[in-house]
């Protein structure tokens, strides 16, 4: 029985090493104009919804009006109700755009995706100069907006101009205090 089990594990080795053809990678995301435009749409996907009461407390989280409909399918304002009652906390806050929890999306991932787009836009075949310039300007504006949103929510933040390589030294990952805009 032991020999049979040993042979069965060695027989699967080549089968498990096969990589499917349709796996999306960063390189394939910028091979055509259409796939690059889809990646640019990903950069837009992180924009906070200003009209959503769970993502914008300015709508209904004041003491003047409290709306809470437990069975309301269209608008559940439980988050804003708890915020108005003083139930916000520092360890796991509502509308956390830093980590992407409790109603907020992780805006540092959005900034990383914008940087990936800006690093790879030069490799797109068939993209005209005016359109390329417009796409670059749009993604830079999104990146600035995400930095502004984080600054507005948390105060001084590191400005992420470019993505840091995974094999970078620890010194390269440290942000000098003078680079943090106050």
Predicted regions located by residue number:
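Proline-centered turn/helix-capping motifs that create local helix->coil transitions or kinks
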Residues: 14, 51-52, 150-159
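Core domains of carbohydrate- and sulfate-ester-processing enzymes
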Residues: 67-76
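Short linear capping/connector segments at secondary-structure termini
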Residues: 22-25, 161-169
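Membrane-proximal, proline-rich intrinsically disordered regions
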Residues: 12-61
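Conserved small/polar residues in nucleotide/adenosyl-binding loops
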Residues: 180-182
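Sec-dependent signal peptide recognition
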Residues: 1-3
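Conserved, well-structured interaction surfaces
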Residues: 37, 45-49, 75-154, 170-176
């Amino acid at each position: 029985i032991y020999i049979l089990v040993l042979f069965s594990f060695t027989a699967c080795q080549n089968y498990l090493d096969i990589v499917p053809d349709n796996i999306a990678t960063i390189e394939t995301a910028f091979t055509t104009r259409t796939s690059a435009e889809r990646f640019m749409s990903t950069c837009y996907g992180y924009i906070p919804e200003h009209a959503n009461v769970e993502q914008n407390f300015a709508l209904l989280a004041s003491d003047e009006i409290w709306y809470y409909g437990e069975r309301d399918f269209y608008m559940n304002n439980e988050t804003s109700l708890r915020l108005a009652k003083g139930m916000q906390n520092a360890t796991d806050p509502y509308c956390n755009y830093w980590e992407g929890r409790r109603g907020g999306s992780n805006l540092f991932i959005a900034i990383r995706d914008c940087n990936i787009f800006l690093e790879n836009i030069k490799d797109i075949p068939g993209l005209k100069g005016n359109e390329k310039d417009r796409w670059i300007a749009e993604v830079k504006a999104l990146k600035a907006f995400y930095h502004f949103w984080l600054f507005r929510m948390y105060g001084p933040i590191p400005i992420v101009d470019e993505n840091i390589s995974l094999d970078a030294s620890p010194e390269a990952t440290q942000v000098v205090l003078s680079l943090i805009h106050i």
